[in-house]
Structures are given as structure tokens and as C-alpha cells.
Design a protein with these regions (language model features):
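Alpha/beta hydrolase fold serine-hydrolase catalytic domain that processes acyl esters and thioesters
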Residues: 1-25, 30-92, 96-112, 116-121, ...
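Catalytic cysteine-centered active loop of the rhodanese-like fold, especially the PTP/DSP P-loop
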Residues: 167-169, 182
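Gly/Ala-rich beta-loop-alpha elbow adjacent to hydrolase catalytic centers
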Residues: 172-176, 180
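Short glycine-enriched nucleophile-adjacent loop
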Residues: 180-189
């Protein structure tokens, strides 16, 4: 029966990396671990201090600080305890931590380096945390290139690998996955050669021009992109067909939570592809964003941030703690938006619904055509039986299918061609 990353740790947590190399599920555990609040516990990347093990952190009197994000407190606590319980992660070393939240630059950036027992490194970028500034930076990716967090990620990789010279993995969940891919594209060429794999766990992609400018094709063979069945975040600006889809025990947007991803033995439960209905929605969203000019996107994002900031909450925890107060502030702020901006917002939203409507219509037409072709094929199949030749023996009466089975095989220098190849 399939479980989650927590069950994986119970089963394989005692096998060291020198016996069982890092796999996709390990990457999820480490990327999620980067969400914990290691401030003051792990050496800052700017100070080049000593490393510390998980065991040493667990013994600190302020260990409860790790679970400051109450949204995932229960899951993060189970993850931490699961990592501590076995040899695989217990003595893993942590170093080069950084956590920046800069309101004036509209950026939230956090990263940490894990040193595994086989000597390899895993550089993990935190995804969007509970800060409202962090969510604003996510939206900024729609029109800014690069956003400050992406620039920081490149500096981080070059700095850490300048001190630690081992081969390394790099990864992140959500925005962290975007930062992992971006930093791999833009880091120094001699550093890039040491990258083993790049993990993007339901991380958003990039505008087409960014992929071209940053030479994504130079690293694409090392990218492991994992998406849940109903992925939306990870399909933003997605132009890379090389992704894998994993099953989740949650539904809809809640599948973005990596603790919901299903694991069997030491691997994820893979499924065929994103749900078709979700694909249509994702295509509409991407087409909509790319159809807007920079001024429209900037106005939309800035107004949204301005309205939410009117609640005076610094993070989502505070925003939702007094939901009524926050929403009253939002409604008041919306009323104060000037007429010109309000009209632009209405036009932007109308265009989203129009594109979505067209996408659904196109899909319905395509479905009808497919069904029509299928019916015609079935009718044609029945008519294709070869009629008996009066001059031939009764035993010679065959259908096309049986004729193919009895056809002589090519021998000598001839080879049978494979379907779909010329």
C-alpha cells in the first residue's frame, strides 16, 4: 500500500547514502526540510562557519523555533523526527543557511546546504513561505526577469560551491524549484559541471524568452521535474515536456502539498499525465499571462499586493487569524482603487475568462472529432474483411488481420521497419 515521505523514512531511514544513493523521495524530504526555521541554529552562508548535525539541532533548547510555520507544523515535526530516527539523515551536516525577507525589494529568499554521508551536497531552496512579500515575488515572476530571489540563488550556488568542492544536487519545492533550475542555468560553467541532478518539485517554469536566453537546453538532461496529478503551480509557463506526474492523496490545489504525494517502497507512485481538465485551465492561464503587456501585468500584481497589504498583515498566518478584519480592509482598499486602474483590472480579468472559454470550446470540438473518427474507423474495420475468391480454395479465405499473421518474414539483408519510423 502506498504511503508518503514519512512512511518512506520509516522503511529506509536506516540505510546510509553510501549504500543507497539519493533518490527522488530523498530530494522531497530535503527540499521540505528547507522550510524549517534554522535561523541562529545553522551557520550563515555569509560567515562560513562550522557545520552542525540534525542530532545537535534536536538537542537545542530552542528547537521548537523550527516549527514556526503553523500551516505545516504537524507535518514538518513528523518529517524532522523521521529524519532523526535513522542513520541515513541523523548525522547529515547542515551549513550555509540564509533567510532574507526584504519588503522594499519585494523578495523572500532562503536556502540551506546539506552534506550527506557519502560526501555529496544537496543545495535546497525554500519555496514560498507564509510571508506576503514571498507571494508578491512569485507574482513578479510573470513580468520581471530576473526577480531578486533568482539573482540571489545564482550567487548562493557560486558562493557555496566555492567553499565546498564536492559533486552536488540542487532542488526546491514550489518557487524553490524555479530557483534551483534558474541557478543551475546561470551559475559558473565550471560549477555547472559538478551538478548531479536538479530537482523542481511542482515549481513554476519560465517565460519562453528566459529559457532561450539562459540556454536551458544545456542543463535539461539533469532536470527532474515532478508534478502532482492536478498541478497548476508547476505548470505556470511550462514549456518543458520532460516532467513526471506523481499521484497525490489530496485533490485540486491541495496537491501542491508534497506531504500528500504518494510513495511506494523507495519511489513515487507515477501516473500518466496531468488531468485533461487541469491542462486546459493551465493552458488558458499561461496564454492569458503571455497575452498581457508588462504594464498590464505589473498593474494587476501591484494592485493585488496593495489590496492585500491593506490588512497590515505581514504573513498569511496573521492575515487568516482575523479573517473578517482582513477582508474588511481588502474591500475598503478595493474601493479606493482609481477608475483607470479599476477599468484595466476588469479588462484583464475579462480576457482571462474569454481565453478560458475558447480553450474549453476548442477541447469540445477536438473531442467530437476524435469520437467521429473512432466511429468511422470501426465501420471501416468491419468492411475490410476480404471476400472469398470463387476460384480459390475455401481454406484461402482470410481477413486482412490473419493475412498479416501468415505473411512470410523478410530474411537476408532486409529488416522489418518499426512502426512510426521511416
Amino acid at each position: 500500500m502506498a504511503g508518503t515521505v514519512i512512511e518512506y523514512l520509516k522503511k529506509y531511514g536506516d540505510i546510509p547514502f553510501c549504500e543507497k544513493p539519493l533518490n527522488d523521495v530523498d530530494s522531497l524530504a530535503l527540499c521540505q526540510l528547507s522550510y524549517l526555521k534554522f535561523d541562529g541554529m545553522v551557520s550563515d552562508v555569509r560567515h562560513n562557519g562550522p557545520s552542525v548535525t540534525l542530532q545537535e539541532i534536536a538537542k537545542r533548547p530552542d528547537v521548537e523555533q523550527l516549527f514556526g510555520d503553523v500551516r505545516f507544523e504537524k507535518e514538518n515535526r513528523a518529517l524532522f523526527e523521521g529524519l532523526l530516527s535513522g542513520r541515513r539523515f541523523r548525522n547529515m551536516k547542515l551549513n550555509c543557511y540564509i533567510n532574507l525577507v526584504e519588503k522594499e525589494w519585494e523578495t523572500q529568499f532562503s536556502a540551506i546546504t546539506f552534506i550527506l554521508d557519502d560526501g555529496t551536497l544537496f543545495l535546497a531552496f525554500r519555496g514560498t513561505d507564509e510571508t506576503i512579500v514571498g507571494w508578491k515575488e512569485d507574482f513578479n515572476m510573470a513580468f520581471l526577469n530576473p526577480v531578486p530571489g533568482q539573482e540571489y540563488s545564482v550567487k548562493y550556488v557560486n558562493m557555496v560551491t566555492g567553499w565546498l568542492h564536492q559533486p552536488f544536487y540542487i532542488g526546491g519545492h514550489s518557487k524553490g524549484g524555479n530557483l534551483a533550475v534558474y541557478s543551475a542555468m546561470k551559475c559558473a560553467p565550471f560549477v555547472r559541471k559538478r551538478i548531479q541532478k536538479i530537482y523542481s518539485l511542482d515549481g513554476p517554469g519560465f517565460r519562453p524568452e528566459v529559457l532561450k536566453e539562459c540556454h536551458y537546453n544545456a542543463i535539461e538532461d539533469k532536470v527532474v521535474k515532478l508534478l502532482p496529478h492536478s498541478s497548476m503551480i508547476g505548470m505556470i509557463f511550462e514549456r518543458d515536456i520532460h516532467y513526471r506526474v506523481v499521484e497525490s492523496k489530496n485533490h485540486g490545489l491541495l496537491q501542491h502539498d508534497p506531504f500528500s504525494w504518494l510513495v511506494k517502497d523507495d519511489h513515487f507512485v507515477d501516473v500518466g499525465d496531468i488531468y485533461e481538465s487541469q491542462k486546459i485551465m493551465n493552458e488558458a492561464l499561461n496564454e492569458w499571462i503571455l497575452s498581457l503587456n508588462e504594464e498590464q501585468v505589473r498593474t494587476f500584481v501591484d494592485t493585488l499586493y496593495q489590496v492585500i497589504s491593506a490588512s497590515q498583515a505581514d504573513d498569511l498566518i496573521t492575515f487568516t487569524a482575523d479573517w473578517k478584519k482582513s477582508m474588511n480592509a481588502v474591500v475598503t482598499a478595493l474601493k479606493e482603487v482609481d477608475d483607470q486602474t479599476a477599468e484595466m483590472l476588469r479588462g484583464i480579468i475579462r480576457s482571462l475568462f474569454e481565453i478560458a472559454r475558447c480553450k474549453v470550446k476548442e477541447e469540445l470540438i477536438a473531442t467530437k472529432k476524435t469520437r467521429h473518427r473512432f466511429k468511422n474507423t470501426k465501420r471501416a474495420g468491419k468492411a475490410e474483411e476480404v471476400r472469398p475468391d470463387p476460384a480459390a480454395s475455401p481454406d484461402a479465405t482470410v481477413t486482412q488481420g490473419s493475412a498479416a499473421r501468415h505473411a512470410p518474414k523478410l530474411r537476408g539483408n532486409h529488416r522489418q521497419g518499426r512502426p512510426g519510423r521511416s
